[in-house]
Amino acid sequence: MTAPVEFFFDFASPYGYLASERIEGIASRHGRSVLWRPFLVGAAMKVSDRKPLVSIPLIGDYAIHDIERFSRYWNIPLTVPSHWPIATVAACRAFYLIARTDQAAAIQLAQALYRCLLYTSPSPRDLST
C-alpha cells in the first residue's frame, strides 16, 4: 500500500488554508490518501528564532500579494481576518481530540474552521477562545 501524504498545516496560515482546499484532490489523483497534521507554526518559529512572514518588511507585503494571487488563481475564496495572525492552540487540540476516534470528522472540522471561521466568512471569528 502507498504511504499517505502527510499534510502539516497551521490554522493561522492562509497558505495552509489554500493547500487544504486542494490537497485531497491532488493526493487522490496520485492514488494516495492524506494524513492531516495541524501544528503550531508560531511555536516552531519561536524555538528557531524566526518571525512570521507578514512581520518582515517587504517580505510581508509580498506574502499578502502572493496569498491573494494564489486565491484568485485557484478560485478559492479568501478573506484574511482583521485579527490575524491568530492563536490556534484550541483548534489544534480539538482536531487531535476528534482524530483519535474519527479521522474523517477531524478533517471536516479542519475544513469548517478554515472555511467558516477564518478565511471565507465576511467577518471571520477569532479561534483563540
What are these regions (language model features)?
Residues F11, Y17-L117:
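Structural alpha/beta surface segment adjacent to cysteine/selenocysteine redox centers
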Residues Y119-T129:
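Single conserved hydrophobic/aromatic residue that forms the stacking wall/gate
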Residues P4-F9:
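Short active-site neighborhood of thiol/selenol oxidoreductases, capturing the structured segment around
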